[in-house]
C-alpha cells in the first residue's frame, strides 16, 4: 500500500512556517522540510518569477532515496509559508487515487496563467475556471516526480514555468499516458488568487468550494498582498479551532 509523505521547502523558521507545520502535526501527516537554515537563492517570488531552488532541493532529496522507497511513497510537495493542510493523509491519498493512476502527477490549478500570460493559448480546453498549472502543490509517485525533474534549472529561474512547459509541450509517456494532470475541481488543492467568492468555511475547519462543489485538502494563499492577508486570517482561524482540542 502506498504511503503519503509530504515534502516542502522553507529556509527560515518564521511564524508562517510554524503555522504550516502546525497544520501538518494536527493532521498527523509524515513530512520533511528541505532547506531550513540555508540561504534562499530562488529570488523574490512576491515580486516576480523565481523558485527554481525548490526544484533543485526536491531533486537532491529524491536522488538519495533507493528504488524501493521511491516506489513505496506517494509524495505531496507543497509550498510552506502560505499553505495549510486541512485533512488527513487517508483523504488525500483516496482522492489522488480516484483522480490519477500511478504514472501521473497531479498539480494544483489556478485561475491565472503565470508567469507567462502568453502561454494561455496552449492550454487545453476545460469547463473549469481553474485551468492553469500552479506549482505550489502537486502529488504523485515519488519515482514519477523524480522523472519530471530531469532538466536542469537555475535556482533563480521560475519553478512554475518549468512545470508548465512540461505540461504543455512534453506531457506524454509513450504517446499515451499524461505525465501531469491538473486538479481542475480543487479536489485536493485550493488556490486563492481570484477565488475569494468561490469558498466558504464549513464547521470552522474545512474549506468548501461552491464553484466546484468540493472540499479541498490544502489551502494555498497564492497571489498579491490582499490575498496573503485574507489567507492569514482564514488559516489562523482554522488553526485556532484545532487548538481548542
Label each residue range with its predicted role.
Residues 17-27, 120-122, 230-236:
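Short, aromatic/basic amphipathic alpha-helical patches
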Residues 1-8, 14-16, 91, 227-245:
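Juxtamembrane luminal stem/stalk of type II transmembrane Golgi/ER carbohydrate-processing enzymes
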Residues 83-125:
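Conserved donor-nucleotide/metal-binding helix-loop-beta segment in metal-dependent transferases, i.e.
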Residues 130-244:
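Catalytic core and acceptor-binding pocket of nucleotide-sugar-dependent glycosyltransferases
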Residues 1-74:
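N-terminal anchoring/stem segment of glycosyltransferases
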Residues 14-17, 52-55, 82, 86-90, ...:
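Generic preference for well-ordered alpha-helical elements
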Residues 31-40, 106-111, 179-190, 245:
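A generic structural motif
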Amino acid at each position: 500500500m502506498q504511503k503519503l509523505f509530504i515534502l516542502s521547502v522553507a529556509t527560515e523558521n518564521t511564524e508562517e512556517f510554524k503555522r504550516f507545520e502546525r497544520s501538518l502535526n494536527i493532521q498527523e501527516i509524515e513530512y520533511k522540510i528541505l532547506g531550513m537554515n540555508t540561504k534562499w537563492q530562488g529570488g523574490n517570488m512576491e515580486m516576480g518569477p523565481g523558485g527554481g531552488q525548490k526544484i533543485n532541493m526536491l531533486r537532491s532529496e529524491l536522488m538519495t532515496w533507493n528504488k524501493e522507497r521511491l516506489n513505496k511513497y506517494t509524495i505531496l510537495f507543497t509550498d510552506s509559508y502560505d499553505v495549510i493542510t486541512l485533512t488527513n493523509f487517508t483523504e488525500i491519498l483516496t482522492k489522488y487515487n480516484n483522480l490519477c493512476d500511478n504514472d501521473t502527477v497531479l498539480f494544483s490549478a489556478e485561475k491565472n496563467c503565470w508567469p507567462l500570460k502568453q502561454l494561455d493559448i496552449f492550454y487545453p480546453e476545460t469547463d473549469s475556471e481553474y485551468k492553469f498549472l500552479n506549482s505550489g502543490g502537486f502529488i504523485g509517485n515519488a519515482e514519477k516526480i523524480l522523472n519530471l525533474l530531469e532538466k536542469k534549472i537555475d535556482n533563480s529561474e521560475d519553478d512554475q514555468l518549468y512545470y508548465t512547459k512540461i505540461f504543455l509541450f512534453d506531457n506524454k509517456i509513450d504517446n499515451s499516458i499524461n505525465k501531469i494532470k491538473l486538479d481542475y475541481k480543487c479536489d485536493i488543492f485550493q488556490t486563492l488568487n481570484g477565488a475569494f467568492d468561490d469558498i466558504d468555511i464549513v464547521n470552522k475547519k474545512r474549506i468548501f468550494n461552491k464553484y466546484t462543489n468540493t472540499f479541498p485538502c490544502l489551502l494555498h494563499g497564492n497571489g498579491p498582498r490582499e490575498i496573503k492577508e485574507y489567507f492569514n486570517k482564514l488559516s489562523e482561524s482554522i488553526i485556532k479551532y484545532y487548538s481548542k482540542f
